[in-house]
C-alpha cells in the first residue's frame, strides 16, 4: 500500500463517482477500478459497494476511511517537517473560493503571502461558496474563502476579512417581472424568483420573503453558485438577491437594476476558514499568521 492509494481512496469516498475521481487524478476509470481492487485484495475486505448508479462505502470502508484520512494528514505533516529543515517554507496549500472571490478579494491576500513565501504553491479550486465548509471538514482543501456560517463548528476557525452587502436585482428587459414591478401594489406572490441552491444569499432572500409574508414564492429556477444567476435575471427570467461583489463583476450587470427596499439587507461576513488542527501545519500556520 502506498500513500497515493490512500489519497485516491479518500477522493473516491468523497465523490462516490469513479469517473470524477479518475478524471481529477489523471487516470482512466478502469485504472482507478484496478487500483481500488488491489487495495481491497491487500486488506482482504470489500471497501465499496458498486453498481451502475452509485458507489457506497461498506462498513469496513467507513473504518478504513478514518484510518486513511489520519495517515494521509500525518504523511503531509511529516513531509512538511522535512522541508522545514530549510530556511524557507515550501510545499503546497489547497485553497477554495468562489469565482467572484477569486478576483474580488483573493488577489490582495495571495499577493502578500507570495511575497513572503515565494516557494509555496497555491492550488486553487473555485466553485459554489456554499460548499466551502463541507470541503474544509472533508479535508479536501486546507483553507477556504467563504461566508461565515450561522453555526460555526467548534473544529473550524474563521478570520473575517470583509462584510459583504447584498441587493435585490431585477431585469430591465420587458418581461413578466418588470410588468409586475410596475403594479401598485406589487403582487410579490406572482413574481418569479431565481434562488441559489444554498448559502447566505439563499438565507437572505428567504428571510426577506418571510418579512413580506410570502409563504410560497414562485421559484423559476434554483442555481448552484451565484455567477450564473445574474445573466438569468438580465434575460428576464426573474428577480434574485445576490452579493454586490457578484453583481458588480458580472458582464451582464448593465442588463439589471437594483431595487430600492424599505429595509436594508443584512450583510454577511466573508473570511478565511480552516480546521483548527490544520494550524499545526507550518504552511497553514504561516498563512493564518499573515492574516492576523
From Swiss-Prot:
Its main location: cytoplasm. Residues 18-37 bind DNA. The keyword Amino-acid biosynthesis applies. GO terms for molecular function: DNA-binding transcription factor activity; transcription cis-regulatory region binding. InterPro entries: IlvY_PBP2 (IPR037404), LysR_subst-bd (IPR005119), Tscrpt_reg_HTH_LysR (IPR000847), WH-like_DNA-bd_sf (IPR036388), WH_DNA-bd_sf (IPR036390). Residues 1-58 form the HTH lysR-type domain. Keywords: Activator, Amino-acid biosynthesis, Branched-chain amino acid biosynthesis, Cytoplasm, DNA-binding, Repressor, Transcription, Transcription regulation. CDD domains: PBP2_IlvY. GO terms for biological process: amino acid biosynthetic process; branched-chain amino acid biosynthetic process; regulation of DNA-templated transcription. One of its GO terms (cellular component) is cytoplasm. Belongs to the LysR transcriptional regulatory family. This is HTH-type transcriptional activator IlvY. It comes from Haemophilus influenzae (strain ATCC 51907 / DSM 11121 / KW20 / Rd).
Amino acid at each position: 500500500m502506498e500513500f497515493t492509494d490512500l489519497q485516491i481512496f479518500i477522493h473516491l469516498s468523497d465523490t462516490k463517482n469513479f469517473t470524477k475521481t479518475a478524471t481529477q487524478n489523471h487516470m482512466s476509470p478502469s485504472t482507478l477500478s484496478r487500483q481500488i481492487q488491489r487495495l481491497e485484495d491487500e486488506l482482504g475486505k470489500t471497501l465499496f459497494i458498486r453498481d451502475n448508479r452509485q458507489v457506497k462505502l461498506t462498513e469496513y470502508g467507513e473504518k478504513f476511511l478514518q484510518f486513511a484520512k489520519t495517515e494521509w494528514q500525518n504523511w503531509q505533516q511529516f513531509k512538511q517537517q522535512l522541508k522545514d529543515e530549510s530556511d524557507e517554507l515550501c510545499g503546497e496549500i489547497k485553497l477554495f473560493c468562489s469565482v467572484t472571490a477569486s478576483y474580488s478579494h483573493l488577489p490582495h491576500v495571495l499577493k502578500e503571502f507570495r511575497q513572503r513565501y515565494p516557494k509555496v504553491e497555491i492550488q486553487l479550486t473555485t466553485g459554489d461558496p456554499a460548499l466551502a465548509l463541507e470541503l474544509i471538514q472533508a479535508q479536501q482543501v486546507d483553507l477556504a474563502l467563504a461566508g461565515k456560517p450561522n453555526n460555526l463548528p467548534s473544529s473550524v476557525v474563521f478570520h473575517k476579512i470583509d462584510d459583504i452587502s447584498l441587493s435585490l436585482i431585477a431585469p430591465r428587459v420587458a418581461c413578466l417581472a418588470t410588468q409586475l414591478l410596475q403594479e401598485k401594489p406589487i403582487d410579490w406572490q406572482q413574481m418569479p424568483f431565481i434562488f441559489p441552491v444554498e448559502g447566505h444569499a439563499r438565507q437572505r432572500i428567504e428571510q426577506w420573503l418571510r418579512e413580506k409574508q410570502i409563504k410560497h414564492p414562485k421559484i423559476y429556477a434554483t442555481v448552484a453558485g451565484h455567477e450564473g444567476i445574474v445573466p438569468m435575471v438580465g434575460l428576464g427570467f426573474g428577480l434574485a438577491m445576490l452579493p454586490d461583489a457578484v453583481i458588480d463583476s458580472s458582464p451582464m450587470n448593465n442588463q439589471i437594476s437594483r431595487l430600492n427596499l424599505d429595509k436594508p439587507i443584512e450583510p454577511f461576513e466573508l473570511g478565511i476558514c480552516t480546521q483548527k488542527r490544520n494550524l499545526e501545519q507550518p504552511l497553514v500556520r504561516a498563512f493564518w499568521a499573515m492574516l492576523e
